[in-house]
């Protein structure tokens, strides 16, 4: 396979590697080409510095992935760790964990309700045991953590790749202090920090972006993250068709209702045909949960890209028209025109101005929308079919299609509260000796007794199943 190397943020060049090629071997190839010592090179990928003893497969490097290699003399205490030698983080029983690669970060837990604080980093599902597709590297999971809308060759929703760059020099040479644990960490600028490894760059702020994971991409090709779309790892039924499908869209209502993408497309087109989208002054033209839940309008309007190009163009047109109407304007009634106009409040005669090729020149009556006339309008008909009709959803289907309910059931079956801080902690095999993952707590306690870890627990039921 081919990976592209950008040395000291210059133009990239291809390097041929195998899945079992080590990072140090990659350094040696680059060092020979650039005429520099291999031990002064640092390989940066997806916000993480890659260790010498890791392989291309370990690092989730795919065909035509772009890695950054910078030349920086080692500072005291760094060289041993980078070589894969006596790194205290690798000691058996050590409590410190390697910062998780962005290629394996899962933010789907952050669609849980606000009262489930902490689960994004504490609760991990076991539903990723799908067998890898044919042709994928051994052991590589097909679980997708992110979804994007690819405006490039795909023109559809695709699995996405999370990447990070330095907000100062805009190069992907920043190593994160810690990985993101929720969508806010990724979507809110300057929320996460790190250290830029580019020479002479003092940058410390992280800037995240997404790429389409279905095809090789260049540095400049980015895609918009659709953070309401998630892999259906909890096997929730769709609120409309009641099938279990994946991926799904999880509405931001209190129940976190789930809808499959085909039904979401149908829901949007139906509402669009009836012009029953909601115009929100802050958000724009949007839709609420299909069950009509309060405070559930979709905030990231790129989710409506699921409509496809033709329907999305209609959505944008109707949204612009609705904006004009909300501002007190009118639409030209001549067939084939429909231009938005903003006449004076007491102006009865409205002319669709033909300047700049935008208007048709038609003069019409503001009251009856017919060709302009003197005197009273002959008839004014009330528009028919403008009443909002509820999208029919079966109550039982709505009850079963809740992301929140599956989460709470998982928590109930696989977790116990920490005796000190009461945060839910998952036990997935292993011994009875637990350690609270909350940095402010870190209590060592017994899963069996529910009390602080002691010699009695150690001698009596340390390794009970």
Swiss-Prot record:
What highest taxon heads this organism's lineage?
Answer: Eukaryota
Q: Does the keyword Phosphoprotein apply?
A: yes
Result of altering residue 437 to L: In PARK2; impaired E3 ubiquitin-protein ligase toward BCL2
Q: Explain the post-translational modification.
A: ISGylated. Conjugated to ubiquitin-like protein ISG15 upon IFN-beta stimulation. ISGylation positively regulates its E3 ligase activity.
Effect recorded for residue 256 to C: In PARK2 and PARK; uncertain significance; impairs the ability to ubiquitinate SNCAIP and ZNF746; decreased binding to the TP53 promoter; abolishes TP53 transcriptional repression
Q: Which organism was this protein described from?
A: Homo sapiens (Human)
Q: Which gene encodes it?
A: PRKN
Q: Where is this region: SYT11 binding 1?
A: 204-238
What is recorded about the protein's domains? The ubiquitin-like domain binds the PSMD4 subunit of 26S proteasomes.
Reactions accelerated catalytically? [E2 ubiquitin-conjugating enzyme]-S-ubiquitinyl-L-cysteine + [acceptor protein]-L-lysine = [E2 ubiquitin-conjugating enzyme]-L-cysteine + [acceptor protein]-N(6)-ubiquitinyl-L-lysine
Q: Where is this region: Necessary for PINK1-dependent localization to mitochondria?
A: 77-237
Q: Pathway involvement?
A: Protein modification; protein ubiquitination
Put simply, this protein is called E3 ubiquitin-protein ligase parkin
In the record, the effect of residue 240 to R is given as: In PARK2; impairs the ability to ubiquitinate SNCAIP and BCL2; loss of UBE2L3 binding; severely compromises the mitochondrial localization
Tell me what happens on changing residue 430 to D.
In PARK2; loss of self-ubiquitination; impairs PINK1-dependent localization to dysfunctional depolarized mitochondria; impaired E3 ubiquitin-protein ligase toward ZNF746
Q: Where does Zn(2+) 4 bind?
A: 365, 368, 373, 377
> Where expressed (tissues)?
Highly expressed in the brain including the substantia nigra. Expressed in heart, testis and skeletal muscle. Expression is down-regulated or absent in tumor biopsies, and absent in the brain of PARK2 patients. Overexpression protects dopamine neurons from kainate-mediated apoptosis. Found in serum (at protein level).
